[in-house]
Each structure stands twice: as C-alpha cells, then as structure tokens.
C-alpha cells in the first residue's frame, strides 16, 4: 500500500479517536439513596420504580448518569453511604436524625410516602387496655435499632424502652404475629403496620392501646458530597418529580407528593432527639 494512502487513513483514525463523545465515568455518576427504614415490602419490589424516579431526577438535573438504591435496613443503608457517597437521599425520620450531624445532611424537601411508616407509632395489644398494661411486660418490636429515637422522640416522655421486656424482631409482620401468638403482650409498631392489621391472619382483636404524636415525613436531603449548585438545582426540581407524566411512577413507589422544605420542618424533633 502506498504511503499517500496510509497517512490519510491513520489521520482519520486519530480524528475519530479525538472526536469520540465522552463516556460517563464513576466520577460523573450521581448516587442517591432511598432509605425507608423498616418499610413494608421488599427492596426488590420497589427498586425498579425507584430506578424510574432516579432517571427522572437525572433528566431534570442534567446529570450524565445517576444510580440509586432502595433499602429498608440501617446497616445496608450505612454500607451504601460509605461505599457510594451519595449526593442526595430520601431518608426516614430516625436515620435522618441519627445522621444529621455526622453526615452533614441538609434538608431540601419532604416526601409524603404511602406505607412508608414512621409518621406515628403505636403500642398494639390483644389483652392490654393501655400503656400501663404494656409496662413490665413482653413488648415485641422491629423498631429497636435506635433506642434514642424511641425514648426521646416517639414516646413523648410517656415511657422508655427500659419500661418493657423487649422482644426484638426483624420483619414488620413478624412483630404483630408475636402478639397474635401470645409471645408478647404488646408490640411497638408504626402506622404502616397498623394499616396492615386487617390483612394479617389472626389479627382480630389486636388494636392500638397507645399512639404517639404525628411526626414529620420522609426527609429529602443533600449529603456532603453535593455542591451548593447541585443542591440548589435539585431542590428546584423537586416539585416536578411527581407531576405530569412522572406521577404514575411516583404512585408505584407510593409517593403522594414531593415538595421543597428546609430544616425548620424538623426543628422540634431535632430538639427532642438531642443533637
């Protein structure tokens, strides 16, 4: 092959290399976490809809690539935060309070999430008539990972966990079944679990004998890895994440509404939690 043909072909290859569109790298990827602590249902069921929500957020914010994770367990959430260093998150109240200072969380908005739980806590029982009937007795719960949250925020001063003989459970329905089977006199549950009562075999007669005050909704937060500009743009996009064509996706995840907010929404519970 002649030299005058080799040179143009080599030059063409070089130009193609130089003009290739940039590929997304790990550094370009914006990570988000959706952490609904002790949420009813499995992560696998929710993940595909969370992926669609994150894709909407990516499009609205002009991110090259976005990835997210739906979790219901604190250890899994903490592992994801450590490994992926997410920029943003939808986080239940208890972990928000626990992480607020250590992870330098900034509240950007709130999400009203159906069946997420955590808006109100109950003591339920078949035999006790009130809180006094649960004290000193076996009380089952899957909400014992953060005793400070229960003692300082949920109870409103009515009790501490030390007042009960605790039976720790892992799954929301398992907690209620402890009462049904007589393995516990009472169970400390949240509003999502109470809503499930009619659908659990043998739950007839299990009722709320004490309830907490209403608590703030799921916090939409920025982690320390998000820049000021990214925070401002993401906050401005929140109102559109569940509107129009995106509403169907939010309905699947159980998100009723998303709106911008700030830390003042959580001022009272922050004070009660004590940090």
Positions of PLM-derived features:
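Bacterial N-terminal signal peptides
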Residues: 8-18
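Bilobed "Venus flytrap"/periplasmic-binding protein-like clamshell domains
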Residues: 35-60, 94, 117-177, 181, ...
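Short helix-initiation/N-cap motifs at beta->coil->alpha
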Residues: 67-79, 165-177, 214-216
């Amino acid at each position: 092959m002649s030299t005058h043909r080799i040179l143009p072909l080599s030059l063409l290859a070089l130009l193609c290399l130089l003009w290739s569109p940039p590929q997304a790298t790990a550094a370009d990827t914006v990570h988000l976490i959706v952490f609904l602590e002790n949420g009813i249902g499995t992560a696998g069921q929710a993940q595909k809809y969370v992926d669609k929500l994150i894709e909407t957020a990516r499009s609205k914010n002009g991110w090259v690539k976005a990835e997210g994770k739906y979790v219901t367990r604190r250890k899994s959430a903490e592992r994801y935060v450590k490994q992926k260093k997410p920029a943003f998150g939808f986080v239940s109240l208890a972990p928000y309070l626990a992480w607020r200072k250590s992870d330098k969380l900034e509240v950007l908005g709130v999400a009203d999430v159906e069946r997420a739980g955590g808006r109100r806590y109950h003591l339920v029982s078949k035999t006790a008539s009130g809180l006094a009937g649960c004290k000193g007795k076996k009380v089952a719960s899957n909400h014992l990972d953060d005793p400070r949250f229960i003692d300082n925020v949920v109870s409103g001063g009515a009790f501490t966990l030390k007042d009960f003989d605790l039976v720790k459970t892992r799954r929301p329905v398992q907690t209620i079944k402890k009462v049904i089977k007589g393995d516990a006199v009472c169970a400390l549950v949240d509003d999502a679990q109470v809503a499930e009562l009619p659908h659990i075999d043998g739950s007839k007669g299990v009722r709320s004998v004490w309830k907490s005050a209403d608590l703030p909704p799921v916090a939409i937060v920025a982690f320390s890895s998000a820049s000021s500009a990214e925070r401002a743009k993401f906050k401005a996009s929140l109102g559109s994440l569940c509107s129009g064509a995106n509403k169907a996706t939010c309905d699947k995840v159980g998100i009723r509404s998303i709106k911008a907010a700030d830390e003042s929404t959580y001022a009272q519970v922050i004070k009660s939690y004590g940090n």
